[in-house]
Amino acid sequence: MFKSFSMDLAGRKLTVEVGRVAAQASGAAFMHYGDTVVLSTATASSKPREGIDFFPLSVEYEEKLYSVGKIPGGFNKREGKASENAVLTCRVIDRPMRPLFPKDYRNDVTLDNIVMCVDPDCSPELTAMLGSAIATSISDIPFAGPCAATQVGLIDGQFIINPTADQKQVSDMALTVASTREKVIMIEAGANEVPEQIMIDAIFKAHEVNQEIIRFIDTIVAECGKEKHSYESCAVPEELFAAIREIVTPQEMEEAVFTDDKQTREKNIAEITAKLEEALAGNEEWLAVLGESVYQYQKKTVRKMILKDHKRPDGRAITEIRHLAAEVDLLPRVHGSGMFTRGQTQILNVCTLAPLSEAQKLDGLDENETSKRYMHHYNFPSFSVGETKPSRGPGRREIGHGALAERALIPVLPSAEEFPYAIRTVSETMESNGSTSQASICASTLSLMAAGVPIKEMVAGISCGLVTGDTDDDYLVLTDIQGLEDFFGDMDFKVGGTKNGITAIQMDIKIHGLTRPIIEEAIARTREARMYILDNVMRPVISEPRKHLSPYAPKIKQITIDPQKIGDVVGKQGKVINKIIEETGVKIDITDDGSVNVCGTDEAMIDRAIQIITGIVTDIEAGMVFNGKVVRIMNFGAFVELAPNRDGMIHISKLSDKRVGKVEDVVNIGDEVTVKVTEVDKMGRINLTMRTSDLAENKTAARTEEK
């Protein structure tokens, strides 16, 4: 049965249609927010997947180019590989949804979101987040929802709920918050050094709006919701846990995990697993879930150590950061390099500079974003965790980590006018034991400064974890979590920022939400740790951006010309600009506003190219002197190229102070000559002279002017 539900959301109409399309999905919501239309569906398999120890949730977000009136490029004219924005949207939908499914549920679940129409003022990403929550809530899939999401901007100190496209361009914050009925379950933010208290207030402003949306979803579920289906639990039998505890005591397990060396811990657990396999040999049913059992035993042990004994697996205090180290200039011929080490996590970052034409071209749904000048790429090779796997290119995790560090650094980068370069930083994970994305922020800052990029402030990143008990008041926030505390804990709260405020947040949790006190403590902890890293580790290594670029980096000089003369510089079919490039070996970028960036490794050739361009766009007037090349000879005189496509003629009588019988007696094709403009007639023809007396007059005038 088709039903439609509507509410006002930030001054725009949100309409949810149920039963109109996709009737065979477990749940489907046809979402309309303003003129944005997204189809969100939730579907589950009828049986659990065998042989896995995780919940197999897949989230898809498909950006259809017809939604913005475009036909895809390429030979096939079809949408291809998911864009970076689509991948990041999948991750931001996944994070609030995943904790709300049962932990022992092993049926495959797919959340599909198809963007069918885009209103720039109504975010399709937000619409898909709401659509996935609604589709799952009304389906028969077990789900502890609903949840809702809201975006918040900050303009002139005022919070803007679900900002429009124009508002996003001037906002100091891009915050997305997802909530359940009582708690915050997901935070994603980019910000222009926003103070911590303002960020906290914005988070809970969004949380208030989310409660209105949840009440709206409740009305939809009340009318259209299906009864949740029963499922086969994959929980480990208590009898097996009891048997394992008799073979390996809690004290033995605690001793196995209590070490600051990741590989030693893994070796200890492998020995315990082998001991259990030998003891339980013959019981195939128990052996099939032994791996999950050992994992759960480790988890319970680590959580008890932290929450009850205030003892972390590597012996650190609750607020203590692992050993830190930083250095720059590891690679001699790259444009900039920096390495940041935190315990057994190590990132080597390399910075590369290029002309603005090398900026990444974007062909997505956002008409305001057609290119990206700063790119941060994150790589995670298998050797960083001591494993052997073939390299298959970046996955969703790598793209997400790269984007988080990129978002943290964008607010401190110089503008294209101040620093006319495209910038790429690449974070290579050398070693990993938690928080590699935050180490990437620190390493990127080091390499940018080493490369001479004049960033406004240094940026550092740190992550906090969480272990909770049975009540909201029973919890412990951990500063600088390592991998084990991430795996077995309840939260990974990543914050990047400067001494002035926050530039990026990403919060992942495994429980049903966080209270305000936990969020406030986590943000306060990350600020304290960030300031320590900036002042005691990074600044002693490099206190400010270098004043000069690497000798191996391209040099760029910028001039501005009259936009109406861009065509003169480019020439018919690009002949003029290509000739300049061929002659000087530089790269030339021209924008519609008349900005000209000339890039090359030889500064003399850059200056030569600028001289040529200046000659092309300069209005030639009588009295001006040029150094030109003879390009054509006639019996009545010679033609001299003053600038590309700008020739002047020297009459034979003006070639010398003496009488000239033949032009070739004075000049030949290819000769470099100094000439003076005597006249520019009404037809634009330029008359020149080489007479010494004429040139001397000009030189005398020039010398007088210099004085």
Language model: regions and residue ranges:
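Short, hydrophobic beta-strand segments
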Residues: 113, 185-190, 231-235, 246-256, ...
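Single-stranded RNA-binding regions, centering on S1/OB-family and related RNA-binding modules
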Residues: 290, 552-556, 563-707
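Glycine-rich, flexible beta-strand/loop modules in the N-terminal catalytic cores of phosphate-handling
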Residues: 25-110, 115-122, 188, 330, ...
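Mobile "lid/hinge" segments at catalytic clefts and subdomain interfaces of large enzymes
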Residues: 140-257, 448-547
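Flexible, glycine/charged-enriched surface loops at secondary-structure junctions
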Residues: 103-109, 144-146, 213-231, 263, ...
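Conserved phosphate/anionic-ligand binding catalytic regions in large, soluble enzymes, centered on
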Residues: 27-29, 122-141, 328-351, 433-454, ...
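Long, basic N-terminal domains or extensions that often function
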Residues: 1-232
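Extended amphipathic alpha-helical scaffolds
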Residues: 1-30, 34-45, 53, 230-369, ...
